[in-house]
Amino acid sequence: MTLTSLAVRRFAPDGPPAGPPVLLLHGFASDGPTDWISTGWPSALTAAGRPVLVPDLPGHGSSPALADTTPKAIAEELAAAVGHVSDVDVVGYSLGARLAWELPAVLPVRRLVLGGLSPHEPFGAVDVEAALAFAAGGRLPADPLTAAIARMITAPGRDPAALARCIEGLRREPFAPEAGALTVPTRFVAGRDDPVSQGIETLVPLVPGSDLLTVPGDHGGALRGAPFRTAALAFLTTP
């Protein structure tokens, strides 16, 4: 197994594996237990015979921040966490979906499920300095987006400096999806009331053979709801 600095929780089925491992990638300012373990994903996947890997992204949860927090650098670190496998399925949500987009370049990805994905770079307009000033005891930023990010990075248990560094790295490689960038079977999933993934349907024509399912809920509700998990499991268990 390749060494990695990331905290990774691994789950195994009771019997022989029925398919490749599944890598679950959480959203910004969250962690693996919050997004995946508490919502029952490892239990559902191992019951279907699948090994599961649940990392904390760099600077999130129990994982230290990386010096380089660009999407490509994080993808390389995630590939190291997975190690040498012949195939892997990936489910990403929000930031996790953004990073999952990069993984077929560095991992033998068999299938992708991308949930809650913004078709645009979501951090481009964030005033990182203002968010950090709030974290240091200053005023809440007037800009609504920056204020929302400021609240996220100062939530209990979060590391504001590490999360701000993550934002800065992501902005150095803005999300600019192009036709043909993904060639693996892909399912997009979006909450019906999720403003973050508004416009996600524009990504479907860029990925040959992909589809889009809409499930109930806003950005957080869609992640926690059973319909998203059901849609992902159905796609991942397709031969």
Language-model segments: which ranges?
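Conserved alpha/beta-hydrolase
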Residues: L45-P64
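Active-site nucleophile elbow and catalytic-triad environment of alpha/beta-hydrolase enzymes
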Residues: A162-E178, D193-P195
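The serine-hydrolase catalytic nucleophile loop
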Residues: A29-P42
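Short beta-strand/loop motif that positions the catalytic acidic residue
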Residues: L182, F188-A190
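Flexible "cap/lid" loop of the alpha/beta hydrolase fold
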Residues: R98-R139
